[in-house]
């Protein structure tokens, strides 16, 4: 058993990096092959050539007949079978150990980088904890990537070796050993009868070893099926990812989104009507349309640079609006509607209204219907028209023109306060009448 200790120590590493079925296969290999082959097979086939007897005295005939009956010893054949079947497992163990060590180095390197980034220096206690956790973590692994492919390949090679040795055993010996073997090879003079020792015991042992080989073969096939179903299940759980070039072309409709949502109990105004914005959906991988060309800078207006505040009139030319007296009929809407195309007439009316207001302010002391010369008359000395005619020209009736108090029309040198009192007395007298 000391000769098998080295192989046993190496195969123990396989047990740490295998599935459940792989561990069962290793158990069958250790107990039912190596152990039985080392303890019982040597005693059964110990006297194999010495007990092979032939009924001839011809020198060399017995050795030639034994070589024809047993080209290779059963024990040596089974040893070769164990070595060949274990070789893929040894190769897988070497790759698994290398993979685990590389993972440990990568994790330790990442931990050091994180420690340097965080600015924390790990002491000896932390390093020992990392080493202990790394040694424990070697037994925990996941069959994925290259490690999974290597594991599947080593199972396939084990299966092929098992099938090859079973077929070779059948062609060499068959599945049983007969007690009588007839030999006619040279230098035997004729057909020679040879006898095999313990044929029944050897047949039972051969059948047992073939059954163990069949169990190992079944475990290999079962493990391949288990890994295949596991891969199919994980592939079905993943979302299907299609490359960009294989996306089918579909006509996508636009999505209409209302810019203003109607509130409950309110009615939208004319300018707040719902406008639908269309956002066309584009396919992945389609060429985007080129953006609109930028407008040249010469289309923009130059801003007028203003200096101090006194120069604001140059940048902003604004005029205050002027107001004219309007009759009651026009205020109430009784006047004739203005035509749409009468824009120049409106400007002339505004100028005349301004001129009338200035004249009325100057003629406060003049009685109604009296003609007074104004500074704005022509050089030829034309007389000013009465106020009633001017008002009629502006579209106002003469009856509705405001009349002034007679006391205020006469020239009076009294101050304004006395004049206002006199006008109020006159108005009260008019009311009493």
Swiss-Prot record:
Residues 127-136, 329-339, 416-425 have a biased composition (Low complexity). One of its GO terms (cellular component) is plasma membrane. Residues 110-137, 329-433 are annotated as: Disordered. Residues 346-392 have a biased composition (Basic and acidic residues). Keywords: Cataract, Cell junction, Cell membrane, Disease variant, Disulfide bond, Gap junction, Membrane, Transmembrane, Transmembrane helix. GO terms for biological process: cell-cell signaling; gap junction-mediated intercellular transport; lens development in camera-type eye. Residues 2-12 dip into the membrane without crossing it. Changing residue 88 to Q: In CTRCT1; severely decreased gap junction channel activity; does not localize to the cell membrane. The keyword Transmembrane applies. It is found in: Cell membrane; Cell junction, Gap junction. Changing residue 118 to E: In CTRCT1; uncertain significance. Residues 43-71, 176-203 are extracellular. Pfam families: Connexin, Connexin50. One of its GO terms (molecular function) is gap junction channel activity. PANTHER family: CONNEXIN, GAP JUNCTION ALPHA-8 PROTEIN. A hemichannel or connexon is composed of a hexamer of connexins. A functional gap junction is formed by the apposition of two hemichannels. Forms heteromeric channels with GJA3. This is Gap junction alpha-8 protein. It comes from Homo sapiens (Human). The gene is GJA8.
């Amino acid at each position: 058993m000391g000769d098998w200790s080295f192989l046993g120590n190496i195969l123990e590493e396989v047990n740490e990096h295998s599935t459940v079925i792989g561990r069962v296969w290793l158990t069958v290999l250790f107990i039912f092959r190596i152990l039985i082959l080392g303890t019982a097979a040597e005693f059964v086939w110990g006297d194999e050539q010495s007990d092979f007897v032939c009924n001839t005295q011809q020198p060399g005939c017995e050795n030639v007949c034994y070589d024809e009956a047993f080209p290779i010893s059963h024990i040596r054949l089974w040893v070769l079978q164990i070595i060949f079947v274990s070789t893929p497992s040894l190769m897988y163990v070497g790759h698994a150990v290398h993979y685990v060590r590389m993972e440990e180095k990568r994790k330790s390197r990442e931990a050091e980088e994180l420690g340097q980034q965080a600015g924390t220096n790990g002491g000896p206690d932390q390093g020992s904890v990392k080493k202990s956790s790394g040694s424990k973590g070697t037994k925990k692994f996941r069959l994925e990537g290259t490690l999974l492919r290597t594991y599947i390949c080593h199972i396939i090679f084990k299966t092929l070796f098992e099938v090859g040795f079973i077929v070779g055993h059948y062609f060499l010996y068959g599945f049983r050993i007969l007690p009588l073997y007839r030999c006619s090879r040279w230098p035997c003079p004729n057909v020679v009868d040879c006898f095999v020792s313990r044929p029944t015991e050897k047949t039972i042992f051969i059948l047992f070893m073939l059954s163990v080989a069949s169990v190992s073969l079944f475990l290999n096939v079962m493990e391949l099926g288990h890994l295949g179903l596991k891969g199919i299940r994980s592939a079905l759980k993943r979302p299907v990812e299609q490359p960009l070039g294989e996306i089918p072309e579909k006509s996508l409709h636009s999505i209409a989104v209302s810019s203003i949502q109607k509130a409950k109990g309110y009615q939208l105004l004319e300018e707040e009507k719902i406008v639908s914005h269309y956002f066309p959906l584009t396919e992945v991988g389609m060429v985007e349309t080129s953006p609109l060309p930028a407008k040249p800078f010469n289309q923009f207006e130059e801003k007028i640079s203003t200096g101090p505040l006194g120069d604001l009139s140059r940048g902003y030319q604004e005029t205050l609006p002027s107001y004219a007296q309007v009759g009651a009929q026009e205020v109430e809407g009784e006047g004739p509607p203005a035509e749409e195309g009468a824009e120049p007439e409106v400007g002339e009316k505004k100028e005349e209204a301004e001129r009338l207001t200035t004249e009325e302010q100057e003629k406060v002391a003049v009685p109604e219907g009296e003609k007074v010369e104004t500074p704005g008359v022509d050089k030829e000395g034309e007389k000013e028209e009465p106020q009633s005619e001017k008002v009629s020209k502006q579209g106002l009736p003469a009856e509705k023109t405001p009349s002034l108090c007679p006391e205020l029309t006469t020239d009076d040198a009294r101050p304004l306060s006395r004049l206002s009192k006199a006008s109020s007395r006159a108005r009260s007298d008019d009311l009493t009448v």
